[in-house]
C-alpha cells in the first residue's frame, strides 16, 4: 500500500499512511510509555551512577539488561493473556514484593552477614551481578508508576484492542519504548556530567567546606536508595489489607460450587480493581457503575444460591428476583416465615438446608493462591449494597455491554449489547467443532433477505393494526378489540390465571412486593422503641403499622398472594407481649381477613381472592452472596434474635454511646437456670457523633481503601475534602483583608486609650450602666470563645489515633497519684514540720478533708457515674475524672471562726468544691478548660509573717524613716538651684550692709518696705504658685460624645481665670502704694537712680512677662478641646476621602468601559445607543448618592438567592420598576437565545415597550434536515429532570431553584389579549404528591410505566416544533375549538395573569421515593404540593387533564371570589382523573389572614386538606403559605396568630359520604350540602347537554361538583383501626397518624431548657449511684447545678401538655434516602413527558378521524361513578393508538417502521413532514396542503447516528433490557444546552 502510494506520487497520502500504520502508532505509544517512570528506575540509576571499575561496568550492563528484559516481558504480557493475568493481579505484588523487599533491606544494611561463609571473591561478585539483574527485572514487573500515573502504559492496552496485527504493534511499541529509554538515560548522564564539570557548583562554599561530601554521598547512596524503595513500596502496599489480618465473613448459608475454576465463596460484591495496579476511586460514591466492573462480570466464582424451604413436607426452592434496588443501610432486615395449612406456629419457621461440607476437604479443594489472595480484593468488598428484596445481597450479573459481531439491519456489525455468555458459547463451539465449515453468505444477499422479511412482517402488522383501528372508529369500543396478553395459567383445568401483580409475563423480572423502610440512621436512639415502620403490603397503604420495634418476631404471612413472592418482609403484627402471651396465629388471621376483605380487590373485578395458593415449583437462579453483613445499628436492634452476627462488619459513622443511666433489675427467679439475665441491664444512652470527616461511611471492615484522587485538604481541620477544580465555587474567599475595618479598629483602640486617661469626678450613672453592660457582653464573648476552644480541644483528642487511651490512662494515673501518694505524703510532711516547730499536729483534720475528696469517673461529656464504675469503652470513647470537694493542704486549721467570715468562706467553698482533673494533674473548672490557680500552702504563712514584721517596724524605726525622707528631699535639689539661692542671699546681705552704712535713719522705713515687699512677695508667690499649679493640670482629650462634661469643665476654667486675673490686679496696685511714705523725705539726687529702684523695675518687668505667659497658658487650656477635635476630624476626613476615592475611580473606569462595550454591542440600533449612552455615561456622584444606595440595599434581603425565584416573578418585579430601568436588560433580552425561554406574553410586552426586537420574537429552527432523534434531544435539555432527582445529582442543585416557579400576579402584563380580560381559560396543573401514589395498585403502576414509555416514543413526532412535541395524548377537536394546555395553569382574570406552576410527578416514584428533605439545602421544607396532612387517604392523582368540552368564551367570574374551575367531570384522554376530592367552597370564604400574590387561589383549587380534623387547625393556611413562600413570610409569623380564631369554611362538598370523625352538627351541614349539590349537578347536566351560551356561574358550580373518592377507603380503614385501638380524642388520633405515617418530626426540648436539663441529668446519674445522696444533692442545689423548677413532679404528663407548657418543641427530621441508578434511569425517561420550565400551549392539530370525540364522551358517560370501584382499570379506555396491540407486537411494529430498508442510514425521513415544519413558538396551522392522514401516521425511529448513549437509553425500553448501565440515562440530560440558531 505504501509502495503503491509512492509510485503514484502522492506524498500526502504516503505520509498519512505512514502515520496511521501500526508501526508508527506502536512507536508513538511506546515512546509515551517511557514517561511512566517507576521505582524500577532507581535501581538502574543506582547501578549506572555509583558503580565503578570493571565490576561496575558489568553491573551496569546487567542492570540495563534486566531493566529491558522486564519491560519486554510487560509488553509481551499485553499479547499473551496468561502472562497478563499473572502480572496484572494484586496478589503478584504481595507475593513477590514483600519477601523481596525484606531480603533487599537486609542485603543493603548487613552486607557482612552475607559475606561470612563465602569462599572466593569471584563467586560473590557473580552473585552480586545476578542480584543486580534480578533487581531490575523483578521491579520492572511490579508495575509501579510514580510519574505521572499508569495511564500512559494503559494506552497500549486500549490500542491493542483495535489493532489487527497485534504482534507487529507489540514489537513496534517496545522499540519505541527502547528509543525513549535510551534518550532518557543519555539525558540523565548529560546532567550528571554537567554537574561534575560545573565550576559554580564545585566552588560552592558548602561543598568546599566539606571535603568528603561526595565520598559520603557515595557511601550512603545504597542506604538512601533502599529507604526510597522501601517507602515507595509501603506506600503502594499500605492500601492493600493483609490477608492474614482480615476476617472472613460469617456465612448465613453454604453455597453450591459448580463449574470449572470455581474458587472462593467469600468474594467481594463490587470490584474496583483495574488493570496495572491502580484503583478506581469509589470511596465517596453512593452508586457504582456496572460498566466499571467488567472483570467481575465474567466471574467464574459466582454463587448460585438456592435456599430450600420446607412447606407441607415438600422441598421448594426460593424464588428470588433479579431486580435490584440498592439501599445503603436504609432498609431493615427481617426474617421471613411461611405458614402451613394447619396453621401450626411451630412449623412456620423458615428452614434453610445447608450443604454439609467438611471444612478439611474444603481446604484442599481451593488453590493456595485463591485461599491467600482473592484477586478482587481478597475477601472484602469496598461497599456492601444490600438488595431490598432479599436478606443477602444479590450479585451483579454480567454487564450487557459486550462487544461482539452480530447481524443488524441485515449487515454484520459490532454490537455492544451482545450477550457475553452467547459469544463465549459460540467460541467454544468453534473450538470444539473445528471441522465444521461455516458458509458465509455475501453481504448483499443477507441484506436483501433481511429487507424482504422485514417488509413482510411490517405489512402484516400494519394491516392488523389498521383493521383494529377501523373497529375502533365504528363505535364498537369493547375490550375484545385489544389484543390479549399471554397470561400465566395457575390451574390448567379451571383455567385460573395468576393475578397481574404476580404474573411474570406481565411484570417482568421485577415483580413482587417491594417493601420500603425509612432510614434507621437518622432516628434518635432515645425513641427507638416508638419507631414505627411503614410497610406497603399489596394495596394496603399506611394502614398496618408496627407498634414495637424492639419485639419484632417471626410472624405468618397469610396473604393469598405469596405464591411467587417469597422474599423477606416485615412482619405485620409484632404486637407487644401481654400477660397471657403473644397473640396466636388464628387471631392474626382474623384481623388480616378484615383488612384483606375490606381493601384488597382485583383490578378488574370486585371479587376478593380468599383461597390460599401454595408455593409453586417456579424458581429462578439468582446469584447472591453467601454472607450477610450488618452495621452497628442493625446489630444492636437484632441482639435478641438468634441468627445475628457476632459483630458488625459495615462501618458506620463514628459514634459514641454516652451512658446516662443503668437500671439493674435483679428481680429474677432464683430457681431459673438461665443466669444470663442477671448481667443484663437497661441502659439509657445518648449517641454522640464525633466531629470529624465521615470518610469511612459504609466501608466494610478490613477492605482496601481506594486512593482518593483530585482531593486536597488545605486546612488543619477540614470537614469536607475539596477538589482543586472547584475551589472557585466556594463562597468563602481564601484570603480577605478589610483595610477600612482595620483602620476603624486601630482608631477605636487609640481613642479608647485616650479617653480612659480622663478621670472626671461627676461621671454619670448612665455611663456606668453602659459600661456594666459592655463588661457583661465582653464576659459573654469571652465565655463563648473559651467554650469554642474547649470544644476544639475535645475534638482534637477525639481525632488523634489512640489519643483517648493515652489520655484516659494518664488521667487514671494522675488520680491515683493525687489521692494515694501525693496528698498523704504532703499531710505527713506538714505534720512532722509542725511537731518540729513545737506545735500540735493536725492529723485528724487533714485526714477528714482528705477522705472527703471524691474522684468520680465521668463519661467524655462529663456525665457522672461513680467512684468505682468506669464508663463503657472508656479507653476508646474517653473519660473525665471529676473531683468533688477537692483537698487543699492548709498550714493550720482555725478553731473558731467568726460567723460572718464563716459564711463568706462557705460561699467561697461552695463555688469551688468541685473540679475536673487534667492530664498534667492540674485542676480545671470545666472539662478541657484552662487550669485554675491552686491555693498556695505558704501564702497564709507569709501573710502572717508580713503582719508581724509591720508591727515590729512601726515604733523603733519611725525617726529614722523621717530623717531619711528629709535627707532625700534635700539631696533631690539640683546644684544649680543651690547656687542661685546662695547668690540671692549674699546679694541681699550686701545691699542691707550698704544701706545701713549710708542712711541709718531710713533703715526702719526701708526695713518696713522690705518686710512689706517680702510679705507681698510671699503672698504673690503663694498665689502665683497656686494659680500655676491649678492651671497646669493635664487636661486630656475628651471623648467626642461627652459634650456636657466638657462644657462644665470649660466653665470651671473660665471662673478660675477670672479670679486669677482679679488677684493679679490687686497685687500690682498694692505694690505701687507700698513705697509712698508721707512721714519721711527721701532725698535722692536727680542724676542717679538708686540700685533698689532698678531692682524693683526689673522685678516688675519679669512679673509682667509672667502674667502674659499665664494668660497664654489659660487660653491654650481653654482652646485645647476644640483644637484636638478639629485635628481628629481632619484625620477622619482625610482617611474617608482616601477610602472613597479608590473605589470611585475604579468604578468610574468600569462604567466607562462597560458603556463602550454596550455601545459597540448594539451598534445596529442608533436610538438604543443614544439612550444607553445618556443613562450610563453619567459620572458617579458617590458621596451624594450614598444614602440612597444604602436605603436600597437595606430593603433587600441579602440572604435570598435570586436563582430561587421563578422567571415570572423576576419579570413581575421588573415590570413594577421604572420604565427606564428595563433598558439595562436590553442586551440580555436581545440575545438570540433568550427568545426560546421567554413566554410569548412577556415577549409581546417587551416588544411594545421597544426593548425587544420583533425579529427575535419567533426564532426559526434551521436544522430541519437533521436527524429527528437529535432534534428531539435538543429540545429536552437538562431542565427536564425532576427537582428531587436533580438534588441527587449534586452539581445541578441550581437547576431546581431555576425550576421552582412561583405564583405571580401581574395586572397589565399581557396587552395583546387586553380585549379578553373577562375570559377565564381553564388549564389544569399536574400535582406533586409522591406519598399518595402508593395507594394505587401495582397493575396501575405498571400500566402507567408502559404508557410513559409509549408516550415518550411519541414525543419524537413533530420534533422541530417543540410545542407539539409535548402533545403526549390525542387531543380532541372541540366544538368551540378551545385551546388545551397541559401541566401548566394560566388564568386570565380581570387583566391578571397568574402563572400557577404545574408540578411534575415521576411516574414510578411510588415505592421508594420518600422526599429527600436533607437535599433541599436552599429551602427549609418540602414543596406543599407533595404532602397533604390529612387523615383521609386521598387517591393518587398522578396527572389529569381538564377538557372543557362545552366551555364558552363568554364565561365570566367575579374577581372578589376565588372561583377556580379545575375539576371537571369529563375525563382526560391519557391520564384520567382517578378521583376528584372534595374542594373547599372558596366563594363563601370571607376572611383570609393574608393573600400574597393570589396564593390562596392555588390553595383553594387543591383537593381538600381536611381542615376540620388536623393536627393544629390554626396553622393550615399559615403552614401552606409558609412552605410555599418561605422567603416572604418569616417563620415567627406562624406562631403569632396561634390563638387567633381563623374562620375556616367547613362547607366541604361530598356526595353520599360521611366523614368518620365529623361531629354531629357538621354531619348535618354536610347532609344539607349534599342536597344542594344534587340540585346543582342536575343544573350542570342540563347546561352541558344543551350547550347553553349563558354560563356566568359555571366556575362556582363546577367547583361544587367535586367528589371525594378516597373517603370510603379512609372511613373503612378507620373503622377497623378503631376496633384495634381506642383513642381518647381526635387530637390523639391525628397525632398518631401524623407521627406514624410521615415520621418527619421530632420532639426536642426548648433551647432555654437544654443546658439546665443536661445539668440535671448529670446530677441525677450521680445521685442514682450513691448510697447516701443527701449531701451531694443539697450541695448541687446550693451550687445551682440542679434546677428544681424544671423537675417534673407530675407523673402522667402527656406530650400535648408538655408542648403546651413550652417544654417540648416540634421540629422536622431530615429524612434521607438514597435511590439507586435504576430508578433515576426510569425517571429520566418518564420525566421527559413534562416540561416544567416552559409552558406548552398546544393547538389541536389532529382531527376527528384519529379518535372520535363522540365515542370518548360515551365511554366517559358509561363510567360516571368512580367511587364505586376505586381500582377500576380505566386505562383500558385510554386511546394511545398502539394500545390495541399487545406489548410485544407494539414493540415489533415500532421497530419495523423505523427500519426504512432502502435508506442508507436506516432512518426514516418524511419529506412532507420535514418541508412543512413550522417556526418555533407558532401554533400549528391547519392548512390545506397538510394532509391529515399523514400527520396521524406513526413516524417512529430507533437508531440514532453516532450516539452510543442514546442507543442504550432507548435500548432499555425497546428490548426490555433491564440490566443496562446507569450512566446512560442520566447523560442525556447532562449534555450542555445547545444553541439553536
From Swiss-Prot:
One of its GO terms (biological process) is protein transport. Residues 259-271, 284-298 have a biased composition (Acidic residues). The keyword Ribonucleoprotein does not apply. It is found in: Plastid, Chloroplast inner membrane. The chain crosses the membrane at residues 18-38, 67-87, 90-110, 127-147, 175-195, 224-244. Residues 249-258, 299-308 have a biased composition (Basic and acidic residues). One of its GO terms (cellular component) is chloroplast inner membrane. Keywords: Chloroplast, Membrane, Plastid, Plastid inner membrane, Protein transport, Transmembrane, Transmembrane helix, Transport. Residues 249-308 are annotated as: Disordered. InterPro entries: TIC214. It is a multi-pass membrane protein. Belongs to the TIC214 family. Part of the Tic complex. Involved in protein precursor import into chloroplasts. May be part of an intermediate translocation complex acting as a protein-conducting channel at the inner envelope. This is Protein TIC 214. It comes from Eucalyptus globulus subsp. globulus.
Amino acid at each position: 500500500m505504501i509502495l503503491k502510494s509512492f509510485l503514484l506520487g502522492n506524498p500526502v497520502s504516503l505520509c498519512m499512511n505512514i502515520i496511521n500504520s501500526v508501526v508508527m502508532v506502536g512507536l508513538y505509544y511506546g515512546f509515551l510509555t517511557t514517561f511512566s517512570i517507576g521505582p524500577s528506575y532507581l535501581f538502574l540509576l543506582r547501578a549506572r551512577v555509583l558503580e565503578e571499575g570493571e565490576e561496575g561496568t558489568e553491573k551496569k550492563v546487567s542492570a540495563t539488561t534486566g531493566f529491558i528484559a522486564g519491560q519486554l516481558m510487560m509488553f509481551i504480557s499485553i499479547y499473551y493473556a496468561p502472562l497478563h493475568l499473572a502480572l496484572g493481579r494484586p496478589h503478584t505484588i504481595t507475593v513477590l514484593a514483600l519477601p523481596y523487599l525484606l531480603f533487599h533491606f537486609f542485603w543493603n544494611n548487613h552486607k557482612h552477614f552475607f559475606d561470612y561463609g563465602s569462599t572466593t571473591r569471584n563467586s560473590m561478585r557473580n552473585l552480586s551481578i545476578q542480584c543486580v539483574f534480578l533487581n531490575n527485572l523483578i521491579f520492572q514487573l511490579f508495575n509501579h508508576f510514580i510519574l505521572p500515573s499508569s495511564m500512559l502504559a494503559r494506552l497500549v492496552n486500549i490500542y491493542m484492542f483495535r489493532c489487527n496485527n497485534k504482534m507487529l504493534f507489540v514489537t513496534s511499541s517496545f522499540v519505541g519504548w527502547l528509543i525513549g529509554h535510551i534518550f532518557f538515560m543519555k539525558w540523565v548522564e548529560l546532567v550528571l556530567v554537567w554537574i561534575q564539570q560545573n565550576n559554580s557548583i564545585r566552588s560552592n562554599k558548602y561543598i568546599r567546606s566539606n571535603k568528603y561530601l561526595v565520598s559520603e554521598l557515595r557511601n550512603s547512596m545504597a542506604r538512601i536508595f533502599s529507604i526510597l524503595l522501601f517507602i515507595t513500596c509501603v506506600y503502594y502496599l499500605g492500601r492493600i489489607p493483609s490477608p492474614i489480618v482480615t476476617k472472613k465473613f460469617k456465612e448465613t448459608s453454604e453455597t453450591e460450587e459448580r463449574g470449572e475454576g470455581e474458587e472462593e465463596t467469600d468474594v467481594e460484591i463490587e470490584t474496583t480493581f483495574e488493570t496495572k495496579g491502580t484503583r478506581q476511586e469509589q470511596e465517596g460514591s453512593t452508586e457504582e457503575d456496572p460498566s466499571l466492573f467488567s472483570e467481575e462480570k465474567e466471574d467464574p466464582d459466582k454463587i448460585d444460591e438456592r435456599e430450600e424451604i420446607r412447606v407441607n413436607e415438600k422441598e421448594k426452592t426460593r424464588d428470588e428476583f433479579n431486580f435490584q434496588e440498592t439501599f445503603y443501610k436504609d432498609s431493615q432486615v427481617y426474617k421471613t416465615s411461611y405458614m402451613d395449612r394447619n396453621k401450626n406456629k411451630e412449623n412456620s419457621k423458615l428452614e434453610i438446608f445447608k450443604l454439609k461440607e467438611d471444612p478439611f476437604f474444603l481446604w484442599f479443594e481451593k488453590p493456595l493462591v485463591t485461599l491467600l489472595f482473592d484477586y478482587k480484593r481478597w475477601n472484602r468488598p469496598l461497599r456492601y449494597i444490600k438488595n431490598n428484596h432479599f436478606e443477602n445481597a444479590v450479585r451483579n450479573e454480567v454487564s450487557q455491554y459486550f462487544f461482539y459481531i452480530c447481524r443488524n439491519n441485515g449487515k454484520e456489525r459490532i454490537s455492544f449489547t451482545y450477550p457475553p455468555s452467547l459469544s463465549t458459547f459460540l467460541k467454544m463451539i468453534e473450538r470444539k467443532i473445528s471441522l465444521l465449515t461455516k458458509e458465509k453468505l455475501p453481504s448483499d444477499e443477507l441484506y436483501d433477505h433481511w429487507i424482504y422479511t422485514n417488509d413482510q412482517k411490517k405489512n402484516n402488522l400494519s394491516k392488523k393494526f389498521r383493521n383494529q383501528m377501523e373497529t375502533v372508529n365504528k363505535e364498537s369500543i369493547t375490550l375484545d378489540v385489544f389484543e390479549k396478553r399471554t397470561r400465566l395459567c395457575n390451574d390448567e383445568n379451571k383455567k385460573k390465571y395468576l393475578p397481574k401483580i404476580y404474573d411474570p409475563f406481565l411484570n417482568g423480572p421485577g415483580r413482587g412486593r417491594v417493601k420500603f423502610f425509612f432510614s434507621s440512621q437518622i432516628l434518635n436512639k432515645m425513641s427507638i422503641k416508638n419507631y414505627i415502620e411503614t410497610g406497603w403490603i399489596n394495596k394496603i397503604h399506611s394502614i398496618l403499622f408496627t407498634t414495637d420495634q424492639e419485639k419484632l418476631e417471626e410472624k405468618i404471612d397469610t396473604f393469598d398472594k405469596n405464591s411467587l413472592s417469597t422474599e423477606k418482609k416485615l412482619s405485620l403484627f409484632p404486637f407487644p407481649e401481654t400477660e397471657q402471651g403473644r397473640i396466636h396465629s388464628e387471631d392474626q388471621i382474623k384481623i388480616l381477613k378484615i383488612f384483606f376483605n375490606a381493601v384488597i380487590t382485583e383490578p378488574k373485578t370486585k371479587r376478593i381472592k380468599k383461597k390460599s395458593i401454595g408455593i409453586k415449583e417456579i424458581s429462578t437462579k439468582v446469584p447472591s452472596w453467601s454472607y450477610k453483613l450488618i452495621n452497628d445499628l442493625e446489630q444492636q436492634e437484632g441482639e435478641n434474635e438468634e441468627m445475628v452476627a457476632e459483630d458488625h462488619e459495615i462501618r458506620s459513622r463514628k459514634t459514641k454511646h454516652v451512658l446516662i443511666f443503668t437500671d439493674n433489675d435483679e428481680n429474677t427467679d432464683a430457681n431459673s437456670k438461665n443466669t444470663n439475665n442477671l448481667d443484663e441491664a437497661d441502659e439509657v444512652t445518648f449517641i454522640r457523633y464525633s466531629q470529624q470527616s465521615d470518610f469511612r461511611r459504609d466501608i466494610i471492615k478490613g477492605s482496601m481503601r481506594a486512593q482518593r484522587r483530585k482531593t486536597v485538604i488545605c486546612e488543619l481541620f477540614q470537614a469536607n475534602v475539596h477538589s482543586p477544580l472547584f475551589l472557585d465555587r466556594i463562597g468563602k474567599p481564601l484570603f480577605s483583608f478589610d483595610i477600612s475595618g482595620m483602620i476603624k479598629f486601630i482608631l477605636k483602640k487609640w481613642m479608647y486609650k485616650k479617653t480612659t486617661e480622663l478621670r472626671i469626678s461627676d461621671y454619670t450613672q448612665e455611663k456606668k450602666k453602659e459600661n456594666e453592660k459592655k463588661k457583661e457582653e465582653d464576659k459573654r464573648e469571652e465565655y463563648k470563645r473559651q467554650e469554642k476552644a474547649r470544644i476544639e480541644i475535645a475534638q482534637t483528642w477525639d481525632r488523634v489515633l489512640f489519643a483517648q487511651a493515652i489520655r484516659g490512662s494518664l488521667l487514671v494515673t494522675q488520680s491515683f497519684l493525687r489521692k494515694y501518694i501525693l496528698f498523704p505524703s504532703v499531710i505527713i510532711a506538714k505534720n512532722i514540720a509542725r511537731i518540729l516547730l513545737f506545735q500540735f499536729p493536725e492529723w485528724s483534720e487533714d485526714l477528714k478533708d482528705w477522705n472527703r475528696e471524691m474522684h468520680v469517673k465521668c463519661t467524655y461529656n462529663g456525665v457522672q457515674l461513680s467512684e468505682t464504675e468506669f464508663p463503657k469503652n472508656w479507653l476508646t470513647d474517653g473519660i473525665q475524672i471529676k473531683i468533688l470537694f477537692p483537698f487543699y493542704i492548709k498550714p493550720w486549721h482555725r478553731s473558731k471562726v467568726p460567723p460572718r467570715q464563716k459564711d463568706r468562706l462557705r460561699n467561697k467553698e461552695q463555688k469551688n468544691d468541685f473540679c475536673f482533673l487534667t492530664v498534667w494533674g492540674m485542676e480545671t473548672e470545666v472539662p478541657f478548660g484552662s487550669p485554675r490557680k491552686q491555693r498556695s500552702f505558704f501564702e497564709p504563712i507569709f501573710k502572717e509573717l508580713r503582719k508581724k514584721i509591720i508591727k515590729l517596724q512601726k515604733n523603733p524605726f519611725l525617726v529614722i524613716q523621717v530623717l531619711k525622707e528629709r535627707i532625700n528631699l534635700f539631696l533631690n535639689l539640683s546644684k544649680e538651684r543651690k547656687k542661685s539661692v546662695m547668690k540671692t542671699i549674699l546679694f541681699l546681705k550686701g545691699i542691707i550692709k550698704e544701706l545701713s552704712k549710708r542712711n541709718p535713719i531710713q533703715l526702719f522705713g526701708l526695713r518696713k518696705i522690705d518686710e512689706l515687699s517680702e510679705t507681698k512677695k510671699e503672698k504673690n508667690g503663694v498665689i502665683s504658685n497656686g494659680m500655676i499649679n491649678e492651671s497646669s493640670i493635664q487636661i486630656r482629650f475628651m471623648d467626642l460624645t461627652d459634650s456636657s462634661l466638657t462644657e462644665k469643665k470649660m466653665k470651671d476654667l473660665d471662673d478660675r481665670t477670672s479670679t486669677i486675673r482679679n488677684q493679679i490686679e490687686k497685687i500690682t496696685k498694692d505694690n505701687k502704694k507700698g513705697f509712698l511714705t508721707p512721714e519721711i523725705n527721701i532725698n535722692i539726687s536727680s542724676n542717679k537712680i538708686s540700685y533698689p529702684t532698678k531692682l524693683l523695675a526689673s522685678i516688675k518687668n519679669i512679673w509682667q512677662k509672667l502674667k502674659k505667659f499665664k494668660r497664654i497658658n489659660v487660653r491654650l487650656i481653654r482652646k485645647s478641646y476644640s483644637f484636638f477635635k478639629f485635628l481628629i476630624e481632619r484625620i477622619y476626613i482625610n482617611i474617608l476621602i482616601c477610602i472613597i476615592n479608590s473605589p470611585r475611580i475604579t468604578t468610574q473606569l468600569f462604567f466607562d468601559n462597560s458603556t463602550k462595550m454596550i455601545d459597540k454591542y448594539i451598534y445596529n440600533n442608533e436610538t438604543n445607543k443614544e439612550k444607553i449612552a445618556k443613562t450610563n455615561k453619567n459620572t458617579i456622584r458617590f458621596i451624594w448618592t450614598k444614602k440612597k444606595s444604602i436605603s436600597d440595599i437595606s430593603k433587600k434581603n441579602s440572604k435570598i438567592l435570586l436563582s430561587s425565584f421563578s422567571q415570572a416573578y423576576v419579570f413581575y418585579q421588573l415590570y413594577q420598576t421604572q420604565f427606564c430601568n428595563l433598558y439595562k436588560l436590553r442586551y440580555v433580552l436581545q440575545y438570540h437565545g433568550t427568545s426560546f425561554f421567554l413566554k410569548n406574553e412577556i415577549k409581546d410586552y417587551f416588544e411594545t415597550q421597544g426593548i425587544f426586537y420583533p425579529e427575535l420574537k419567533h426564532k426559526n429552527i434551521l436544522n430541519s434536515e437533521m436527524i429527528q432523534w437529535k432534534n428531539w434531544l435538543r429540545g429536552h435539555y437538562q431542565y427536564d429532570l425532576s427537582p428531587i432527582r436533580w438534588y441527587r445529582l449534586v452539581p445541578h442543585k441550581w437547576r431546581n431553584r431555576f425550576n421552582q416557579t412561583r405564583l405571580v400576579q401581574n395586572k397589565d402584563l399581557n396587552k395583546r389579549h387586553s380585549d379578553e380580560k373577562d375570559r377565564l381559560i381553564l388549564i389544569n396543573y399536574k400535582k406533586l404528591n409522591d406519598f399518595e401514589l402508593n395507594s394505587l395498585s401495582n397493575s396501575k403502576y405498571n400500566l402507567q410505566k408502559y404508557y410513559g414509555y409509549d408516550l415518550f416514543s411519541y414525543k419524537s413526532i413533530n420534533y422541530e416544533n417543540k410545542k407539539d412535541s409535548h402533545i403526549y395524548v390525542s387531543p380532541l377537536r372541540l366544538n368551540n375549538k378551545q385551546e388545551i394546555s397541559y401541566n401548566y395553569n394560566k388564568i386570565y382574570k380581570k387583566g391578571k395573569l397568574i402563572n400557577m406552576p404545574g408540578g411534575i410527578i415521576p411516574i414510578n416514584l411510588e415505592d421508594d421515593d420518600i422526599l429527600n428533605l436533607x437535599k433541599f439545602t436552599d429551602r427549609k421544607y418540602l414543596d406543599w404540593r407533595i404532602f397533604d396532612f390529612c387523615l383521609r387517604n386521598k387517591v393518587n392523582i398522578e396527572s389529569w387533564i381538564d377538557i372543557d368540552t362545552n366551555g364558552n368564551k363568554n364565561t365570566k367570574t367575579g374577581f372578589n371570589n376565588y372561583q377556580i374551575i379545575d375539576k371537571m367531570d369529563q375525563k382526560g384522554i391519557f391520564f384520567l382523573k382517578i378521583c376528584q376530592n372534595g374542594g373547599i367552597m372558596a366563594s363563601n370564604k370571607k376572611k383570609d389572614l393574608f393573600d400574597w400574590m393570589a396564593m390562596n387561589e392555588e390553595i383553594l383549587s387543591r383537593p381538600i386538606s381536611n381542615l376540620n380534623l388536623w393536627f393544629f387547625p390554626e396553622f393550615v393556611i399559615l403552614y401552606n403559605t409558609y412552605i410555599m413562600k418561605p422567603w416572604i413570610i418569616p417563620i415567627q409569623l406562624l406562631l403569632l396568630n396561634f390563638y387567633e380564631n381563623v374562620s375556616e369554611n367547613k362547607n366541604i362538598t361530598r356526595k353520599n359520604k360521611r366523614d368518620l370523625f365529623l361531629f354531629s352538627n357538621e354531619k348535618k351541614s354536610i347532609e344539607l350540602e349534599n342536597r344542594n349539590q344534587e340540585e346543582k349537578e342536575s343544573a350542570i347536566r342540563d347546561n352541558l347537554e344543551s350547550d347553553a351560551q349563558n354560563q356566568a356561574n359555571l366556575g362556582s358550580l363546577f367547583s361544587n361538583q367535586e367528589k371525594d373518592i378516597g373517603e370510603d377507603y379512609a372511613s373503612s380503614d378507620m373503622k377497623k383501626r378503631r376496633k384495634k385501638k381506642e383513642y381518647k380524642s381526635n387530637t390523639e388520633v391525628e397525632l398518631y397518624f401524623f407521627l406514624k405515617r410521615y415520621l418527619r418530626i421530632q420532639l426536642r426540648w426548648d433551647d432555654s431548657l437544654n443546658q439546665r436539663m443536661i445539668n440535671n441529668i448529670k446530677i441525677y446519674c450521680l445521685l442514682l449511684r450513691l448510697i447516701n445522696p443527701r449531701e451531694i444533692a443539697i450541695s448541687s442545689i446550693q451550687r445551682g447545678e440542679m434546677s428544681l423548677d424544671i423537675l417534673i413532679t407530675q407523673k402522667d404528663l402527656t406530650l400535648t401538655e408538655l408542648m403546651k407548657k413550652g417544654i417540648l418543641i416540634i421540629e422536622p427530621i431530615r429524612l434521607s434516602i438514597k435511590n439507586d441508578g435504576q430508578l433515576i434511569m426510569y425517571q429520566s425517561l418518564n420525566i421527559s413527558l413534562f416540561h416544567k420550565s416552559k409552558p406548552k400551549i398546544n393547538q389541536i392539530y389532529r382531527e376527528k378521524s384519529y379518535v372520535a370525540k363522540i365515542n370518548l364522551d360515551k365511554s366517559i358517560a358509561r363510567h360516571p361513578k368512580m367511587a364505586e370501584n376505586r381500582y377500576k382499570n380505566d386505562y383500558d379506555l385510554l386511546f394511545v393508538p398502539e394500545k390495541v396491540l399487545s406489548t410485544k407486537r407494539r414493540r415489533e411494529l415500532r421497530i419495523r417502521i423505523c427500519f426504512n430498508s432502502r435508506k442508507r442510514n436506516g432512518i426514516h425521513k418524511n419529506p412532507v413532514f420535514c418541508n412543512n415544519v413550522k417556526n418555533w413558538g407558532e401554533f400549528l396551522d391547519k392548512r390545506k396542503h397538510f394532509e391529515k392522514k399523514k400527520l396521524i401516521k406513526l413516524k417512529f425511529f430507533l437508531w440514532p447516528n453516532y450516539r452510543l448513549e442514546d442507543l442504550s437509553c432507548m435500548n432499555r425500553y425497546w428490548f426490555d433490557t433491564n440490566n443496562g448501565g446507569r450512566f446512560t440515562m442520566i447523560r442525556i440530560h447532562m449534555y450542555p444546552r445547545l444553541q439553536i440558531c
